[in-house]
């Protein structure tokens, strides 16, 4: 009898974390690697937030708090939704967890039974399918490639709904594409949902504050208040405030769902870190004046990366409305040979080639459920980003154009 549960047969380690691990190993060995794989901001946590955490430590705020988060933080979250999204939530409709990932994990553990289906537009954040599978649910993938602007249409959604559908996942702005749903697109999705009252929606809004070109962010519950009881919204402090390591995420939804998720959390991590909660209160209640400049900085990096990668004849690039990723179509390079004679057959091969030849770490598109693409994160310095993109361009220029998987001369 194996000590390892068969539950793990249905899931795999995070491929993005695997890329980060390999990159760190190469850097430690002295290799000049530029890492474009990590999904976290490159600026530091603002000083006022750090000072709030230091004060909490000095004040001895180091004990257990409420399992679902301390009331002061939940009040700050409630105020945030009213101030920024014009949505009213009660404190018992809010849960705080150890990062947005735990919020989502709790959600599916508390709501899915075997046979329940979850519609996941592809490409998707790598953890969605595995968390659904761990919760005995069944992921249902709907391909939304560059020809669809990486977004799920109302028509594609309706075709995917069955009597077993329990959840739809919407991530806007998206990881890995940066694609963002506008008012009309969300309104059309809401029209479909009104026809199917058994379908709930998880709206992952973690990149809410990183949008470009005057794009106006909307969350689904804001557009369809009549569906509020069926919409669970996930957010957190990781991206807007560069607090990925502080591990504070939050979710808002129906009282019954929050109560069930709190039970799950009480038997896993219990409360989130008390010190991080105090820091999160300051992030939400304190100055917000650095958010727009940081987003503008990301926009400049997006434009720089696009200006270089668009020169590569094998690539097709989508101009994202938010987040800090490019999801580049690269299938035209498949079938061609590298200088060493190896044929690039898929996105894994191409990512390996860029790591070996260009010394640039990217994440293959298949990790996000869509072959024929690769993801870069431009959350790095302008200088490093420019050098990385030039290296990618140069590496693609040295690939043979005469060989293909079909055996063409």
Swiss-Prot record:
Keywords, comma-separated and alphabetical: Aminotransferase, Cytoplasm, Pyridoxal phosphate, Transferase
UniProt xrefs under Pfam families: Aminotran_1_2
GO molecular function terms noted in the UniProt entry: glutamate-prephenate aminotransferase activity; L-aspartate:2-oxoglutarate aminotransferase activity; pyridoxal phosphate binding
Residue positions binding L-aspartate: 39, 125, 175, 375
Catalyzed reaction equations: L-aspartate + 2-oxoglutarate = oxaloacetate + L-glutamate; L-arogenate + 2-oxoglutarate = prephenate + L-glutamate
Feature type site, description Important for prephenate aminotransferase activity: 12
Location(s) in or outside the cell: Cytoplasm
Domain of life according to the entry: Bacteria
Record EC number: 2.6.1.1, 2.6.1.79
A Gene Ontology term for the protein's cellular component: cytoplasm
N6-(pyridoxal phosphate)lysine: residues carrying this PTM: 239
GO annotation, biological process: amino acid metabolic process; biosynthetic process
Cofactor(s) for this UniProt protein: pyridoxal 5'-phosphate
PANTHER family per the UniProt record, alphabetical: ASPARTATE AMINOTRANSFERASE
Subunit structure: Homodimer.
Membership in a protein family: Belongs to the class-I pyridoxal-phosphate-dependent aminotransferase family.
Known function: Catalyzes the reversible conversion of aspartate and 2-oxoglutarate to glutamate and oxaloacetate. Can also transaminate prephenate in the presence of glutamate.
Name of the protein described by the UniProt record: Probable aspartate/prephenate aminotransferase
Originating species: Rickettsia felis (strain ATCC VR-1525 / URRWXCal2) (Rickettsia azadi)
């Amino acid at each position: 009898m194996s000590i390892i549960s068969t539950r793990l047969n249905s899931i795999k380690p995070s491929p993005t974390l695997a890329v980060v691990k390999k990159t760190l190993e190469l850097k430690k060995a002295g290799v000049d690697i530029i890492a474009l794989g990590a999904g976290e901001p490159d600026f530091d946590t603002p000083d006022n937030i750090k000072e709030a955490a230091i004060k909490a430590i000095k004040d001895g705020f180091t004990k257990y708090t409420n399992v679902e988060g301390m009331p002061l933080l939940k009040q700050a979250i409630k105020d945030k939704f009213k101030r920024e999204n014009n949505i009213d939530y009660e404190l018992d409709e809010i849960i705080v967890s150890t990062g947005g990932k735990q919020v989502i994990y709790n959600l599916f553990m508390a709501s899915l039974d075997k046979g329940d289906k979850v519609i996941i537009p592809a490409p998707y954040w790598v953890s969605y399918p595995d968390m659904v599978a761990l919760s005995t649910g069944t992921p249902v993938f709907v391909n939304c490639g560059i020809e669809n602007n990486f977004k799920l249409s109302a028509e594609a959604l309706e075709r995917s709904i069955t009597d077993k559908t329990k959840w739809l996942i919407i991530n806007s702005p998206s990881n890995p594409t940066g694609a963002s749903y506008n008012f009309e697109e969300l309104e059309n999705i809401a029209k479909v949902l009104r026809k199917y009252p058994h379908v709930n929606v998880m709206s992952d809004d973690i990149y809410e504050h990183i949008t470009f070109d005057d794009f106006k962010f909307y969350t689904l519950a804001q557009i369809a208040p009549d569906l509020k009881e069926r919409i669970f919204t996930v957010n957190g402090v990781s991206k807007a405030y560069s607090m990925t390591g502080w591990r504070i995420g939050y979710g808002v939804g129906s009282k019954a769902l929050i109560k069930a998720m709190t039970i799950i959390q009480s038997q896993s991590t219990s409360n989130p870190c008390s010190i991080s909660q105090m820091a999160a209160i300051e992030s939400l209640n304190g100055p917000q004046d650095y958010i727009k400049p940081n987003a503008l900085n990301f926009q400049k990096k997006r434009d720089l990366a696009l200006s270089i990668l668009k020169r590569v004849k094998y690539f097709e690039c989508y101009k994202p409305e938010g987040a800090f990723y490019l999801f580049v179509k690269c299938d035209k390079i498949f079938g061609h040979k590298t200088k060493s004679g190896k044929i690039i057959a898929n996105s894994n091969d191409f990512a390996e080639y860029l790591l070996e030849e260009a010394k640039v770490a990217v994440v293959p598109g298949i990790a996000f459920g869509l072959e024929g693409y690769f993801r870069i994160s431009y959350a790095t310095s302008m200088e490093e980003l420019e050098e990385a993109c030039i290296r990618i361009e140069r590496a693609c220029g040295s690939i043979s154009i005469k060989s293909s998987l079909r055996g063409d001369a």
